[in-house]
């Protein structure tokens, strides 16, 4: 179809193609908007400190330790307040595995229909500070929805051809 009018005029004759092409255009727009509107803050904080920017405030509230079967978890508690006053508690963790001795960062991810918010933390060597990375990634869910639409259009086309034969 060339215009929106053609899309509605032809109705279901090319339904699979329309769904897949709509999914692809949604994918391109989602990636574009994600790239334009993403933001990231990388800073070093210790317990009790606060990082302030014009868009949000990140407060490092507390650290808890938790012993699991094959690793020890260090869980940070952060409060993120955006410019609108929305309050968000994030809890990224560091995992220290026993055999072999490996340290990994586990992100805390908060997702809604428009944005994903990620936070990770790492040790800063020989200091009481932790390296904090906070990212806001808009339209991540829409990237996945567009991929599902592309696959759905392909499946409809596949089964439609099978049914016609």
What are these regions (language model features)?
Residues 1-165:
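Solvent-exposed, non-transmembrane regions of integral membrane proteins
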């Amino acid at each position: 179809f060339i215009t929106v009018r053609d899309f509605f005029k032809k109705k279901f004759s090319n339904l699979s193609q329309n769904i897949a092409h709509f999914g692809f255009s949604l994918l391109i727009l989602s990636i574009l908007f994600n790239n334009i509107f993403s933001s990231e803050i990388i800073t070093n904080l210790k317990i009790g400190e606060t990082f302030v920017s014009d868009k949000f405030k990140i407060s490092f509230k507390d650290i808890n330790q938790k012993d699991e079967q094959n690793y020890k978890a260090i869980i940070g508690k952060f409060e993120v307040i955006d410019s609108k006053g929305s309050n968000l508690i994030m809890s990224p963790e560091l995992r220290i595995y026993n055999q072999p001795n490996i340290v990994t960062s586990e992100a805390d991810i908060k997702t809604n229909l428009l944005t994903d918010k990620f936070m990770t933390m790492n040790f800063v060597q020989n200091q009481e500070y932790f390296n904090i990375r906070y990212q806001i990634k808009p339209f991540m869910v829409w990237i996945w929805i567009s991929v599902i639409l592309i696959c759905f259009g392909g499946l409809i086309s596949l089964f439609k051809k099978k049914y016609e034969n």
